Amino acid sequence: MDKKPLDVLISATGLWMSRTGTLHKIKHYEVSRSKIYIEMACGDHLVVNNSRSCRTARAFRHHKYRKTCKRCRVSDEDINNFLTRSTEGKTSVKVKVVSAPKVKKAMPKSVSRAPKPLENPVSAKASTDTSRSVPSPAKSTPNSPVPTSAPAPSLTRSQLDRVEALLSPEDKISLNIAKPFRELESELVTRRKNDFQRLYTNDREDYLGKLERDITKFFVDRDFLEIKSPILIPAEYVERMGINNDTELSKQIFRVDKNLCLRPMLAPTLYNYLRKLDRILPDPIKIFEVGPCYRKESDGKEHLEEFTMVNFCQMGSGCTRENLESLIKEFLDYLEIDFEIVGDSCMVYGDTLDIMHGDLELSSAVVGPVPLDREWGIDKPWIGAGFGLERLLKVMHGFKNIKRASRSESYYNGISTNL
């Protein structure tokens, strides 16, 4: 079945959804050959690619959103239309919409739940070449299938959460087995302790630290200059990136005081380095940085409040989309990660190239110049992209939750430390 372009999807609902999942009511929009010019009821304006594969188009097809824009005053009827409208099929579902979501009451631990199979399949491409610079996940103890001779005992939600925390991506364990929770927990704890023993004996390298070193080597070997900039930045830098108090991203900034904040991205200081190095270094200028960033995120499954980014950029000659895509391909092939490139847009840069692994966005890449460049004194062509290292690790090692790849006291290399 053909995917409908974005203009058809928004025409069917009269709504627009931002990158943060906020539904806006559209006041007016115009469609050119490849662009859509949108004016929201709240007064915001947007120019986006008329794409079939961008994040917003996918969300429209799956009828998913997080909240509504209060200034747009999206009605229940509008939401009902968004949830039930199908532009790719003739089947419709009647949905009852209420203004506020209902809060589910917590189920007491004494109430039993029906057992369900729990499995953590590895989603990343398996690597058998141990000579590569990318670390391979620690091997778990081989799993022997357990015969099912009696009905499985019911597990509470907290017990299921405990089992999920102890599972490794290589475990293939079904909860439809006649094992009490304590016995199952004991078996998984033993496996994880064995994993730690092997890791301590054979490797001793943290996945995130190892990936940082491998990425640094990749870019230095390709003549990029490594940058290490301050984590505390002037709040004015954020405003110059177009993030003012009216934007959604502004609410995610960790502010130290009225003049300083923790950097939410690496771009501001890289902009400054490009401007200064342009007076010193020969053409083209190629720089990169690997370091932590901070945002107040609410969606914990794919986002972290403290995360690690790599941003690379080149300014001057050779700054074409073809060269950017070639470098991205070389980088992800180096990490043995499958991907596809789709067009999208963002509030800061406008048109972007989204680097996707399935439904997971790995990066947004940009071909400059863009209007924002004037704020930083940049007047030359440039290309660049940013990747979240924890997301790369999640794909590389098949982690179900991104917290397993993060700076954490609860997990080490994806293994629970609460044993």
UniProtKB/Swiss-Prot annotation:
InterPro entries: aa-tRNA-synth_II, aa-tRNA-synth_II/BPL/LPL, Phenylalanyl-tRNA_Synthase, Pyrrolysyl-tRNA_ligase, Pyrrolysyl-tRNA_ligase_C, Pyrrolysyl-tRNA_ligase_N. One of its GO terms (biological process) is tRNA aminoacylation for protein translation. Coiled coil: none annotated. Its EC number is 6.1.1.26. Keywords: Aminoacyl-tRNA synthetase, ATP-binding, Cytoplasm, Ligase, Nucleotide-binding, Protein biosynthesis. GO terms for cellular component: cytoplasm. Residues 101-157 are annotated as: Disordered. It catalyses: tRNA(Pyl) + L-pyrrolysine + ATP = L-pyrrolysyl-tRNA(Pyl) + AMP + diphosphate. It is found in: Cytoplasm. One of its GO terms (molecular function) is pyrrolysyl-tRNA synthetase activity. Its main location: cytoplasm. Residues 125-143 have a biased composition (Polar residues). It comes from the Archaea. HAMAP family: Pyl_tRNA_synth. Catalyzes the attachment of pyrrolysine to tRNA(Pyl). Pyrrolysine is a lysine derivative encoded by the termination codon UAG. Belongs to the class-II aminoacyl-tRNA synthetase family. This is Pyrrolysine--tRNA ligase. It comes from Methanosarcina barkeri (strain Fusaro / DSM 804).
